[in-house]
Amino acid sequence: MYDNVLEMELLSGKIRELTQLPKALSAGTGVFYESKIYVFGGDDGTTFKRVEAAILEIENQEDGKIKEELIARKNSLQENHPGFSNENWAYDLKSDSWIKLSPFNGLSPVTTTAVLNGNQFFIPTGEVKAGVRTNQILIGEIK
């Protein structure tokens, strides 16, 4: 999960750090439209970190019975994944600031792309929970 935002000047290769995301995210998607970068959803790592901690605990456990209980707890964490963040953000390049936008209704996909057509964006498929892909296509309008 990262909250760093970098800008690269393509001709010179110069990189500059911009204002951080209000919260660290990974695997979200976004588009650029009229001097703003729109970031849709993302994984804040809450469940990921808990699952990774459980895996480490399982690996370090020697007692078979306790290990089975830990595996069951880890599996439950994964099966009951709440989904990813449905928060949306816009970064205004002119003011160097973030604006919180209305969230998506329902689950927000990650590990996908967004396509812009005019002021409409399309987010096809993606994961809505860890390992759970969706066939939904989200369509939105930037106003």
What is each model feature region?
Residues 1-143:
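Kelch-like beta-propeller repeat domains
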